A protein has these predicted regions:
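Metal-dependent catalytic neighborhoods of phosphoester/phosphodiester hydrolases
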Residues: 73-74, 96-105, 133-138, 191
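A short acidic, helix-capping loop that chelates divalent metal ions and anchors anionic groups
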Residues: 93-98, 156-158, 187-191
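C-terminal domain-boundary segment and adjacent tail
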Residues: 13-27, 69, 191-219
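A cross-domain feature marking catalytic cores of carbohydrate-active enzymes
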Residues: 36-38, 63-65, 87-89, 126-129, ...
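Active-site beta->alpha N-cap acidic-glycine motif
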Residues: 4-94, 102, 106-109, 113, ...
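His/Asp/Glu-enriched short active-site or ligand-binding loop at hydrolase and phosphoryl-transfer sites
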Residues: 131, 137-173, 213-219
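Charged helix-capping and loop-helix junction motifs
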Residues: 103-107, 161-168, 194-201
């Protein structure tokens, strides 16, 4: 089954499938988009929001529906503080293991959870693990959701990584217009990984300032 996977961060595959990894707007000339997957998390998300506020930065949160249902107040806070709330799915499951019916249900339930929490529908979708099945991609596009992957990632879910390594992975080769992937939750990764992410985020903002790069929403 895995041979049918689409490689999201391998440029030729992503580009051939029209899966964006970079910003398309005019604001991308001097900006990057920081995105967070897997939340909302009771500890990780508030800490990330505090750091974003301290740096007057904007970010996009790809949330998991089952976590939204548990903590709708956190999702409302994300939106109220000027960030974007987008869809990562209702559950964190690999699309290749799901039927078309299961995929449709996952996307519909995830969308409904966001709508109930913030009163608005998501416009972007990112699949768990960054992998679309052919059915999943077709369903997402049929619902007028735009896929968005990433150009740089910190691999911050790993158990033995460090804030410095996370920051270096993000910043190495980073250029204006790139979409950055980080995680504000540890539901589907190593325990308390979001703490390292928060520390890495401070390092990332220090370097973004030195490069005169702003942050924008991934819209």
């Amino acid at each position: 089954m895995i041979r049918h996977a689409f490689a999201p961060v391998h440029e030729p595959f992503a580009d051939s499938l029209a899966l964006p990894r970079r910003l398309e707007s005019a604001t991308a000339a001097r900006a990057v988009a920081i995105t967070f997957d897997d939340g909302p998390h009771p500890d990780g998300t508030p800490r990330v929001l505090e750091i974003l506020a301290a740096h007057r930065a904007q970010a996009t949160f790809f949330v998991i529906g089952e976590q939204v249902v548990r903590r709708p107040e956190l999702v409302r806070r994300i939106a109220e503080e000027g960030h974007s709330v987008q869809l990562h799915g209702y559950r964190h499951r690999l699309q290749l293991r799901l039927t078309a019916g299961q995929l449709r249900d996952d996307i519909e339930r995830g969308t409904a959870a966001i709508e109930d929490a913030v009163g608005a529908s998501p416009s972007l979708h990112r699949p768990p693990y960054g992998i679309y099945s052919s059915s999943g991609l077709e369903i997402v596009r049929a619902r007028h959701l735009r896929p968005l992957l990433w150009a740089r990632w910190g691999k911050d879910w790993r158990k033995f990584t460090t804030p410095d390594r996370i920051a270096r992975r993000v910043l190495s080769g980073l250029r204006a217009g790139d979409v950055i992937l980080l995680h504000d939750a540890d539901f589907y990764s190593s325990k308390r990984s979001h703490e390292r992410t928060a520390q890495a985020l401070e390092l990332i903002f220090t370097e973004l300032r030195s490069r005169e790069l702003d942050t924008v929403l991934a819209l």
